[in-house]
Each structure stands twice: as C-alpha cells, then as structure tokens.
C-alpha cells in the first residue's frame, strides 16, 4: 500500500492499481448530485449484504479491489464504525451506493465509495453536498477508468473539483513464467515478444523470457534468445493483475 511503499518498492514491487482522488466544497457537489429515494447510516455489520451487493457490481471488471466474504465484510464494517460512519443510498430496486467516511476539522473524508450505477453515484454526491455548513471540503475516491468529469458543468475538472491520481495497490511477480503463462488474450493477437528481465532482489528470475500469443492464450517460457525489450521486475509487477478487462463507466447522462 502507498503508506508502506518505501519498504516494498526496493524489493521489486510495483503499483498496479490507481484511482482518482477528488476534493470539492460540498456546495459544488450539489450541482452534480441527485437525491436518492432513501438514505440511512449503518450502526452495525448486520446489513453487510447491502454493501456486498453494491461492491460486487462496482468492482466487477475492475482491477485492484479485494475479494470480501461475510467475515471480511463484518470486520471491515466494524473497524469503520469505530472511527467513522457508513452511509447507504437506495433506489427503487434496492441498495445503490455506499460511503465510508469520517468528519474531522470541517473536512469530510470518504475513504471508500462504491455505487451500482450513475444514479447511485449522484446519490452519494448529494449526500456529501448535504453537509454544507458542517464541513468545508469533501474528499473522495473513484476508479481511474471513470470519465464522468468530462460531463461536469462549467469545466469543473481541476477548477472547483480537484482531481488527481492516487495509487492504492502494490503487487510483486515472484515467478514470471507462472505469472504470465496461460493468461487469456484476444484470439486476434498473434506473435511473440522476447525481453530481458532484471531482478536484483530475486536474481534467479533474471534472464530472457518469451511471451507468445496463440489461440487466445499467452504462453511464457524462459530461454536464451535475442530479446526485443529490457525491463526490471517492478516494471512487470506494475502491470494489471487480476481482472484486466477495461470497464466502460455508465454514461453520466443515464
């Protein structure tokens, strides 16, 4: 994680997941939000299934988010309630979005935000906007594949809503062959590439690798051939891990 990056980076770890960190005055969010059918704050982990249904839809086809079962949800919720709050918004079909947040020094910090659709996102914006008078600034995080800022009114990007990238997940390839061999790819992709890898922390990984695309699969092997590319282990550790499908966000006009 970023807070411990100085410890992990020298060991060949690389950032492979980023998100947007956004901040704005609550009154600015009012123009972008739309009130939910209903909204409530959780007081216990008993309703974890409401959050889980939102989280599954939100993280589907996205990269870098953790898998959560019932126990991990209960632990996650209980930890949040020790120091902050959890808001859940609902539409006519059920839970639509949630927010983990704290209030401190006239600032609302939403450490986790998830929504099922654009209506859920707007409901969370409206919830944050509802804190006008009690906070001066709202800070929240959204996926890097989110392009809703293109539709914000009056050029909001970097103007009244500050928007910057924020890394949030580190990974490390231990065995390059195992990491790449068998990965799916488009059947239209054919050919191969050879690269020299340098791994100073695990020197047994250093060498020349060949990646070959055949019939929708990647085949990897380590062999002594002429190579096209030279890179360090942290370069390939920073590639997308887990689900690598690009996700098209719902249209903000929906």
Kindly label every feature range from the protein language model:
Residues 1, 133-143:
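Conserved GNAT acetyl-CoA-binding A-motif
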Residues 1-19, 145-160:
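Conserved active-site alpha-helix within GNAT-family acetyltransferase domains
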Residues 2-3, 46, 68, 143:
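Short beta->alpha linker loops
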Residues 15-111, 118-122, 126-127, 131, ...:
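Amide-forming acyltransferase catalytic core, primarily the GNAT-like/NAT-type
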Residues 112-115, 140-144, 197-199:
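Structural motif
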Residues 144-182:
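Active-site loop ensemble at the mouth of alpha/beta enzyme cores that anchors a bound cofactor
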Residues 192-246:
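Low-complexity, glycine/alanine/valine/leucine- and proline-rich hydrophobic stretches
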Residues 247-252:
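Conserved small/polar residues in nucleotide/adenosyl-binding loops
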């Amino acid at each position: 994680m970023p807070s411990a990056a100085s410890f992990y980076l020298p060991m060949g770890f690389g950032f492979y997941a980023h998100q947007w960190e956004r901040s704005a005055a609550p009154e600015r969010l009012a123009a972008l939000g739309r009130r939910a059918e209903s909204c409530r704050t959780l007081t216990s982990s008993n309703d974890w299934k409401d959050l889980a249904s939102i989280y599954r839809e939100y993280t589907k086809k996205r990269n870098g988010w953790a898998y959560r079962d019932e126990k991990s949800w209960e632990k996650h919720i209980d930890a949040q309630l020790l120091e902050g709050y959890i808001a859940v918004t609902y539409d006519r079909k059920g839970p639509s979005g949630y927010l983990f947040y704290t209030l401190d020094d006239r600032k609302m910090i939403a450490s986790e935000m998830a929504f099922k659709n654009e209506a859920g996102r707007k409901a969370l914006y409206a919830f944050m906007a509802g804190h006008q008078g009690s906070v001066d600034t709202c800070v929240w995080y959204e996926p890097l594949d989110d392009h809703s800022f293109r539709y914000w009114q009056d050029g909001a990007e970097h103007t009244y809503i500050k928007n910057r990238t924020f890394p949030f997940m580190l990974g490390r390839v231990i065995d390059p062959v195992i990491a790449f061999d068998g990965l799916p790819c488009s059947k239209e992709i054919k050919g191969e590439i050879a690269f020299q890898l340098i791994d100073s922390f695990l020197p047994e990984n250093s060498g020349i690798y060949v990646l070959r695309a055949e019939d929708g699969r990647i085949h990897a092997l380590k062999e002594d051939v002429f190579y096209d590319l030279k890179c360090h282990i942290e370069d390939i550790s920073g590639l997308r891990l887990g689900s690598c499908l690009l996700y098209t966000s719902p249209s903000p006009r929906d």
